[in-house]
Amino acid sequence: MFKKIIFTATVLAGMTATGSAAEKLKSFDHAAELTSQAKTILFQELNTADVPNKGHQQIVCLAENIYFEARAESMEGKAAVANVTRNRVEDKRWPGTYCEVVQQGPVRESWKTKQHADLPDDQRIYYPRKHRCQFSWYCDGKKDIIWANKEKSGLTIEGNARAWREAVRISIYVHGHGGFRVNDNTKGAVYYYAHNLVYPTWADQKDLTVIIGNHTFMK
């Protein structure tokens, strides 16, 4: 029943594997570190959906946002966070890519590069300013790691591994791969907050669209 409401099946024809995602996935900037099983899950899902290499970066950025913002939420709750992120990408008030939307906020330059006046701009290192981002996990000062398994023993952390797989899968669907389309269950929301933790001052100026799990969605 849930898939009929949130995930609409699409027709995919002639899909054939073109190589391992583990081989195709190149180095790129993203916010979180992935444990070995988190990487394996990512590669498995990219392979299954036959996602072209050029789409990997945006998929990972969205998947990380879903995971850190809604790890403990249901599939419906995770899809809702994905939809808010997508709605922002499609809204001219926000940047036009998933990575830019997720990482939006003021930055500061690292002292390591700031001390070199003649260093080219593309070689400078910047970090987000603490607690100044659109999505709090990205600049809360904590090290972001997707712990799908324990570091020493390698044992799977079932809840985290499942949440990461769901986040990756939803992100793949949002990007038009994997055979399902993610319908907007937030009714066009571009804001949300965790109502069990906080009531933000800006909420009084926004319109409520829906409540899903521990998040209130607004536009």
What name fits each language-model region?
Residues 22-219:
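Bacterial extracytoplasmic/cell-wall-associated proteins, especially those involved in peptidoglycan
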Residues 14-18:
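N-terminal signal peptide c-region/cleavage motif recognized by signal peptidases
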